Amino acid sequence: SEFFRNYPIQIDYSKQKITIYQSIQDVKKIQKFQSNFLEISPESKPFTSIDFMHQLTYTNQKMLIDIGNSDGLWLFDNQIGNLKPLQNVFSDELGKGFSGSINGKRGVISSSNLGKYKLKLPLIAVPDDKSIQYLNIKNNRKGSIGNEILRRFTIILDYKNQLFYCRPNRDFKDVFHYNRSGLTIIHDQFEWRNKKAEIQFNQNNSNQKNYSTSHHINYKFKLKPIYKIEAVRKNSNAGLVGLKENDRLMKLDGKQVNKMSLDDIENFISTQDVSYLKK
């Protein structure tokens, strides 16, 4: 946190690149970024404000900038007040907290604005009051901005000058998506897998004529990841086809998952139908 206080940090989501600057003046084309006020809490957590539309207009809603949150927005119903029911709503496990699972609802609102940039029909999450009763919500915080919104921008956190900069990237107009399958996949452990290679040996016979022969030998061992299902959302597609907790995931659309990263798997099940899943 002390490091963030001293140097502007740029996160380029589309290039998956983080750049640390000596000062904000060192950022090229900084004039193309929109700047917004950045409030820093005593715990060095960054906050900014957004507006959103959902039957009513909600302005200057203070949000934690949470780069560890994979959702778009978390809205705290008990802090906002008068939040209308979401569109296309369903219950889900939103994540894990110190006291266990964080449950709530996911759905759609009309739009949200990050500065002058308007995002249409963002998918959002509303945690149950019971799930966040031990969360220390203070300083008039209304929720969190997560990576499903942040990834559509290049952002700069300038703690020293208390400014948050953002500029849309090539993913800005992407349709918002969520994990359609209803599965929570985790990396469980590794296993050893061996490969075989064909090795050719040249040999001479007594008449000095060369001939060759081939043999298969085990030549390389590699650690391959094992993925399993940690949770299945109630009434989800995954549950309907019979997938269960602790099932081992073997293939996605015919492809061995031990050749994929966890990010690859999560991206796949967020955009594909559960019929591609096999256990």
Give residue spans per PLM region.
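Pepsin/retropepsin-fold aspartyl endopeptidases
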Residues: 1-279
